[in-house]
């Protein structure tokens, strides 16, 4: 390879490396801070589908930054804890497990709180996209295995208002 071509290729690699450091380095994805955002908390009631009410202590993810961070870097979770993602409208929702250290159950709910679909025991660190089977407004993430342990079935629905 001619010297000039090697130089251009080396320059390209250097620029690519610099971009990688700036975009995905310690400050996070394209400049977003890796610091965990503050989350409001609430009590969530969930009818598991047979009239039995379950209660969870949840962190509320309501902003794009909170949606992006979610439960990343959480090392342990109580059986009655979770995170409720609240979106502005209905859409097919897609989640992955990047930087998530524990298995999670993901429950997708429509704007009336009815269970649309669920993913059980999503593997930590997986980059596989987990999508709702239909439009959803809410996504509840619980400790992996909670759906089975708590008997949450296809007729499950959220109880509103939150914290009530």
Stretches found by the model and what they are:
Residues 11-25:
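Bacterial N-terminal signal peptides
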Residues 28-164:
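Compact, glycine-rich, soluble single-domain proteins
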């Amino acid at each position: 390879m001619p010297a000039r071509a090697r130089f251009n290729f080396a320059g390209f690699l250097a620029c690519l490396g610099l971009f990688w450091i700036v975009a995905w380095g310690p400050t996070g994805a394209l400049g977003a801070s890796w610091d965990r955002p503050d989350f409001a908390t609430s009590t969530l009631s969930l009818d598991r589908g047979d009239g039995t009410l379950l209660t969870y202590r949840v962190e509320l993810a309501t902003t794009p930054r909170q949606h992006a961070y979610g439960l990343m870097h959480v090392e342990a979770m109580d059986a009655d804890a979770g995170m409720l993602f609240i979106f502005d409208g209905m859409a097919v929702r897609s989640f992955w497990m990047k930087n998530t250290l524990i298995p999670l159950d993901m429950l997708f709910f429509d704007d009336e709180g009815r269970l649309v679909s669920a993913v059980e025991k999503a593997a930590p660190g997986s980059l596989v996209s987990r999508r709702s089977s239909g439009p959803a407004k809410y996504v509840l993430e619980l400790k992996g295995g909670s759906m089975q342990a708590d008997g949450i079935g296809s007729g499950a629905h959220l109880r509103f208002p939150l914290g009530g």
